[in-house]
Amino acid sequence: MKKLTLREQQLVCLNILDYFHALCERYKISYSLGGGTLIGAIRHKGFIPWDDDIDVYMHRDEYQRFVDVWFQETHEHYNMETAEDILAQYTGEMAKIFDCRTQITDAKGRKSPMFMDIFIYDGVPNEPKIIYPLMKKHRRIKLRFSSCKKRWLRAKENTVQKAILNKLSHFLFSKMQKNLAQFQIKYPIKQCDYIGLVLSDYGGWQKSYMPKEYFNHVIYKEFEGRQFQVMNGYHEHLTQYYGDYMKLPPEEDQKPHHIQEAYIL
């Protein structure tokens, strides 16, 4: 195995993004660079110098189209973990695309291939004051499921405890998925003025939704010498989420936050 420098890690992530982007372009699927990756595109025209991952955003319907396309094709070096996979690291919250030729140890000591995150936006109520109670309800179920799932996966094999936690985890997973499906029927994106990350705590609930007009369509912005899709209201979104996003953080915060070490296998 070869240990990767930060820049080499970034280039692996960039290759994943290139692969994802090419598939989206081929099938006319929309997405947007998100989070620190979006800041990087606008402020640095590439990675934030100390960043070590890639984030993208997708509307639910575009995400579902992408999943359908992904599993119709074969991918030599890449694997996708969907948000609907009960064994996913962040079931319900996000999807991931992994480069199976690599291995990382993250800040919590967990090992996995290097990956790109896909955050999924659903329609949410047009009245912001009722968004939080609804998100809180759905996230409460998700937290119960996540807690049970951890105990299930850690329990000893071939024990009564393992069997009980298995059944309970699947019950809570089904309940979470059913509730989310009902939510999506009640608040279809096309009829909503706001979109949000219903099951994700990414940034706290106040920052996990935005006016749909920020992400009505996409434009293209430079990132590492390439052109990638970016939401039309990127400035408004980044200002809502980060404030003065063009200002560099304090020097002591200018360091990688996700990966402890990374290797090419």
Swiss-Prot record:
Tagged with keyword Transferase: yes
A molecular function (GO) term: transferase activity
Keyword list, A-Z: Lipopolysaccharide biosynthesis, Transferase
Assigned EC number: 2.7.8.-
Biological process annotations from GO: glycoprotein metabolic process; lipopolysaccharide biosynthetic process
Protein origin, superkingdom: Bacteria
Family recorded in the similarity comment: Belongs to the LicD transferase family.
Further details from the record: Lipopolysaccharide (LPS) is a glycolipid that is a necessary component and antigenic determinant of the outer membrane and has been shown to be an important factor in the host-parasite interaction in a number of Gram-negative species.
UniProt function note: Transfers phosphorylcholine (ChoP) from choline diphosphonucleoside to the lipopolysaccharide (LPS).
Record protein name field: Lipopolysaccharide cholinephosphotransferase LicD
Organism field: Haemophilus influenzae (strain ATCC 51907 / DSM 11121 / KW20 / Rd)
Biological classification of the source: Bacteria, Pseudomonadati, Pseudomonadota, Gammaproteobacteria, Pasteurellales
Primary gene name: licD
